[in-house]
């Protein structure tokens, strides 16, 4: 069971229109009631970080009261999304030093830092992270669990999912986008269709030698694929790699590759585009074979 409680003194006064002590009593009574009924209790301390700036003693008292009443996790909420990672990390560390609570983190993305703030909280000692798939949420969104989980597991080597589950990230992210009728972002970290896409000829030449030269992780680790884009920036390596994706080996067809490169550049200069038109590129390619 998740409860939401005010931890900012100004919100208690102006939004709840009650006394600070009464707010603490309501938190205590609610948690104890649920615990007696056998419920696990998660408390979301709303506006915690803004409250900590305003009145740190009271914000800490909310955490202590909830912990003593038996809350399993107290999630510190950056409800307005205005925190930056360095300050947030310092606050989480301070709270852990001054209470015995098991802390979680709940971030909004109003500064574009929801993912970074969540990771900073974990590094500071939080053991519970709240967020949403693809970062969906009010205003500018919540912390994207897809990126958070991938970062924790791939970068921090923390096994937060069962073995092999992370490889479902791409499929799940896009399934959720379809169900919610929200167009997926091509540039979403890890699972966007452009996350491991390459266009520049220099990149393609290096990727032929070793994909890790221009990729921070193996795209298969999150169920994604490397994509080679064909455009007016394409060189011979780009054309050869894209052709391999389509099942056509041009490694011994240097003249064909040269003609395809020139045709692509000429057509793109007239307004055509091949980046998301694999079938059109394949037709052009087969015309030159």
PLM feature segments, named:
Residues 2-103, 118-126:
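Alpha/beta enzyme core
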Residues 20, 49-52, 56, 78-85, ...:
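Hydrophobic alpha-helical scaffolding
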Residues 60, 112-116, 142:
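Glycine-rich phosphate-binding loop at the start of an alpha helix
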Residues 129, 143-146, 152-158:
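Contiguous mid-protein beta-loop-alpha structural module that forms a pocket-lining wall or clamp
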Residues 150, 156-289:
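A mid-to-C-terminal "edge-of-domain" accessory segment
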Residues 120-123, 150-154:
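Short glycine/serine- and small hydrophobic-enriched flexible loop segments
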Residues 110-133:
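Small-aliphatic-rich amphipathic alpha-helix that forms the alpha element of a beta-alpha
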Residues 88, 140-147:
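Histidine/acidic-residue-rich catalytic or RNA/ligand-binding cores of hydrolases
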